[in-house]
Design a protein with these regions (language model features):
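Surface-exposed loop and adjacent secondary-structure segments within mature catalytic domains
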Residues: 181-202
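Cofactor-pocket helix-loop regions in the catalytic cores of large enzyme subunits
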Residues: 1-180, 207-232
């Protein structure tokens, strides 16, 4: 995540997509609720009407699996209407022309056909996101657990960079993980291919460092098995 929970509570505007936070991440959601109660506008894009959507300025019921088209539609409006942060993009981002060429293929009308969200709603959301700085974006497994999950994540990041919302307090991209403390477990090295801090077991320098720190003669130099490999 690029923001802390303390940032969540003080956000100026929040965009939640593919996340039933109130049930899956109630602690994180409590900070979002604090921000909303303090006046931060909230937009929730989710096929279902979740409890968090009831607190939103607007619930956007996109079709399952249409996230990229919907996000491309938003970015199309930002670019064609000149609402994106031109200075931020020019000074901090790469690949803008390639992104522009792609999202211009998704005017709101085409994005609406795919996502089920009206073209007018797409325009409204894009304009609202551009009206406040910074905006904080959050997503969960509703974005990642798809065959197009990587593209979903890239689209979320591209949207925030286009708006100039990455690298600032109260503005960023915040993925909430899928299982209880999976982030902390991974950070600490509870994975079959890395030590603490994602330092690979097949890296001799990393092994030597942890052998010395842990006071052991040798550590495994081959990655262990992932769950699919165990099942096989």
């Amino acid at each position: 995540m690029t923001n802390s929970f303390a940032d969540f509570a003080k956000a100026k505007m929040i965009f939640v997509i593919g996340s039933n936070m109130t049930e899956a991440h109630p602690v994180a959601a409590s900070f979002v609720k604090q921000a909303v109660l303090a006046g931060a506008p909230l937009f929730v894009a989710d096929p279902r009407r979740t409890a968090l959507a009831d607190m939103a300025e607007l619930h956007i019921p996109i079709r399952v699996g249409s996230d990229v088209a919907f996000l491309n539609g938003l970015m199309n409006v930002l670019i064609t209407e000149g609402l994106y942060d031109r200075e931020y993009v020019q000074s901090r981002c790469n690949g803008f022309e390639e992104l522009k060429a792609k999202v211009l293929e998704y005017p709101p009308e085409r994005a609406a056909e795919i996502s089920g969200v009206s073209a007018e709603t797409i325009r409204t959301v894009a304009r609202r996101l551009a009206s406040v700085k910074p905006v904080m974006l959050m997503y969960t497994l509703g974005i990642t657990e798809h065959t197009c999950g990587v593209n979903n994540v890239l689209s979320c990041a591209n949207l925030q960079m286009l708006l100039g919302n990455v690298g600032f307090e109260y503005g960023g991209v915040n993925p909430l993980r899928g299982q209880n403390n999976v982030q902390g477990a991974c950070d600490m090295g509870a994975l079959p291919n890395v030590f603490t801090g994602y330092q690979r077991v097949d890296n001799a320098e990393a092994r030597a460092k942890f052998e010395e720190a842990w006071g052991v003669a040798s550590l495994p130099d081959k990655p262990g098995l992932m769950i699919p490999q165990m099942l096989e």
